[in-house]
Amino acid sequence: MNNIPIFPLSSITFPGGYMPLRIFERRYLDMVKNCVKDNTGFGISLTNNIDNEYYDIGTYCKILDWEQMDDGLLGITIRGKSRYKIVNKVVKDDKLIIANVEMMDEPNFADIPKELMPYSDFLKNILEQYPKFYHDDAPKYFTESGWVSSRLTEILPMELKDKQVILEIEDYLVRLYRLKDYIDSKKNI
């Protein structure tokens, strides 16, 4: 088990995903400083907007880049590395959450079945039209169900709680079929 700082957000990322963040609270500025100094990461857990609580399953992320922004805030770019489950946690005096987590195994690699390839093509078209959704120079795996389901979940305008459900699903193909149902339900709107 690992102890990691937790950054509760009203946003979600998956392993392999990129996310820009603007840091301004002292506890998180200190967290970022320590992560950069120690070459470690932190956890992103989705807030559930009830009692300032957050989900136990989240994504462990590493900081790729940081910069002082024009408005004085710290800008960082993170990349999701692996999912975790919080076993227990403590809240430090500065309100930073430190959690003891179990890193979760990712499902086995699975190619996308032929009947789901149109959803991979859908993702490819989105990323060609809107490259800001994913780093231009990052590798793209349009035939791999885990990568496609993760990127689709990150960019689709789904309810955050529904994205969390996808993050918690252990099987990449089940994730992709769930996303297929979501996309198909929106085609006639």
Describe the residue ranges of each PLM region.
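N-terminal low-complexity, acidic/polar interaction/targeting segments
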Residues: 1-189
